């Protein structure tokens, strides 16, 4: 596992907001999940529609694991890697890495099922 990988990754809503919306951890009725802050009325303009984009903890862990594996494989091969523009989809969730430095990996995610609601 890559050291501090959880702290390096920042996840943002990929639902085309004017400004970046970093996902926030939420306590759901049955489990913890990450959601777009634009879901809550206090974080949006009155005419703005609520954003339902969210990701479960299981899917979040999968995302971290995927990124970690890519970095580990490159490290094992002794080859430098930059994951900027790397895209993948799993369970109707699209991921794209838009920034990759030694300190930060910025990921935009879009849950196609949640956004339809």
Where do the protein language model's features map onto the residues?
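Basic, low-complexity terminal or inter-domain segments flanking catalytic cores
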Residues: 1-117
